[in-house]
Amino acid sequence: EIFLVTKVQPSDFAYKRTLSAVRESFRKLDAGYIDLLLMHWPNPDIPVAETLTALNELQAEGLIRHIGVSNFSPALVQESMRHATIFSNQVEYHPYKNQAALIEQAKAEDYLFVAYSPLAEGAVRNDATLKSIGAAHGKSAAQVTLRWILQQGLSAIPKAGSNEHR
């Protein structure tokens, strides 16, 4: 089963541009619906309420099932939650990036925290501590890192390591 996720760019956060951009993505994807539509990066020039009004309409039309955000701070997630049901926040998270405030908020407010770049763009592979932990369990440093994220009750979307899989 495929869970189809796409994003609307900050340059398209104005109400009419959001409607147009998402409808164009929907047309290009040629799917019955989009499972999750993310607002990609905050745009300080356009209120989240404006974008979320458009996304709520698209959700009511059945084009999208869930609304999420990406790279939003706890305060901006809170503001977004006043205008829509927020399904997830996709943010950079790995052993070198502290996101404790967002993780705490995600658990308290019951939205999905999605860790992107969980392998720190490959840096975890050479981390002596992670390699040592992995060696003790017959696992790689990358496997240790992903397990650490999953054991926190979070979700992770690692990027492929080779260009042919990207």
Where do the protein language model's features map onto the residues?
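A short, structured active-site edge motif that brings together acidic residues
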Residues: 1-12, 33-42, 71
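Short, conserved acidic/polar surface loops in the N-terminal third of protein domains
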Residues: 14-19, 48-50
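Local beta-strand N-terminus motif with an aromatic residue
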Residues: 1, 31-34, 64, 86
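CE4/NodB-like, metal-dependent polysaccharide N-deacetylase domain
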Residues: 18-38, 57-61, 111
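Beta/alpha (TIM)-barrel catalytic core signal, keyed to glycine-rich beta->alpha loops juxtaposed to Asp/Glu
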Residues: 42-166
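Residue-level signal for secondary-structure boundary sites
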Residues: 12-14, 97
